[in-house]
């Protein structure tokens, strides 16, 4: 398996620190609003990579944080007349709701920055003690000149970084720095802001130090993969490298991965430009398979343009794949022969080439676009060569292979009519029992869970009916 490493700017063989295990940290959302589909691409991309690593047999410890204290959250809390904690609680809940609908698997750990304040204070204190940070009137800055490798992740020269930092220097706070490139790792309290007691007075952590601290605390001094959106490469990830490696003297992450932007009219989708669609808005019109297919249709390091036309095209493609699955499921009920023939064994062995080709594509820096092509080749083959004269065993094995290759992409796992009917009927009965017992929370949960899997329930005078939705 080869991964493009932002740090070295080339594809490298993936060799985990511990054989068979992967320690992976992905920068998660700042929880002050619903996440937009550009953020969603990052979450879907690294969910897919995590799924594929598990498919290949790795045990993945997947950490994705919540930034629940920063300037945007303070501003939001002030606007809504509430607390930063309440804003965080609200939008973490909303994140899970949308992420679950996008079939994004829950992280092994979802740390909140505010849960690690004591660890962050200790991290900052050690950097000061080592001479990598200094305090000015309650603010603490990282001394970038002290860290000789500053700029190595983003590939920028010190001269370019200094020029850019000088151009940005305009405030009194900047003038107090030893160097324009220095960045805040602890911020003194301002009126009306939440703060914690520390050796430098009341204050709160800087954004960059939060991820460094949580990654170290949960995964250790050196991790296998650190990932996030391309826009985080500099300054966020660059600063993470500096402060983490300054503290430990060890390499922070062996592989750095970054997903490209989602664009609208050739501009990056962002809240600041007000040119975004929330994932929640999109999910009102398209289901998770369609959104994920759209994201997977381009390599994760290539920018992708967002449009309803492209989503409609993705929807048509997903329907083709589900039609192939539906054809096989219908055949299971139609074929009369149970056991596979010798000729069918040879054909089934020929289908294995699709698994091998799929793995070859995904092992090459997670090339999901080519992996989707393999899926279409497989379904075209089964549509052509499997029919009512085939054995039930062959039909089942072909069906399982399609679903197997869809799973790492988070695709093709929804129920289709004609399969798993017993499970649906059982859930409908559980829902009816819950309603009789006035357990409406359970009743609603069963209904919503089925809807997320592509099944809609209809309460009629004749009883409950169900149907598949696109």
Curated annotation (Swiss-Prot):
Compartment(s) where it occurs, according to its Swiss-Prot or TrEMBL record: Cytoplasm
Keywords, alphabetical: Aminoacyl-tRNA synthetase, ATP-binding, Cytoplasm, Ligase, Metal-binding, Nucleotide-binding, Protein biosynthesis, Zinc
Motif position, 'KMSKS' region: 268-272
Reactions listed under catalytic activity: tRNA(Cys) + L-cysteine + ATP = L-cysteinyl-tRNA(Cys) + AMP + diphosphate
Gene Ontology MF terms in the entry: ATP binding; cysteine-tRNA ligase activity; zinc ion binding
Location, primary (coarse class): cytoplasm
Domain of life: Bacteria
Binding site for ATP: 271
HAMAP family, per database record: Cys_tRNA_synth (MF_00041)
UniProt name for this protein: Cysteine--tRNA ligase
Record organism: Clostridium botulinum (strain Eklund 17B / Type B)
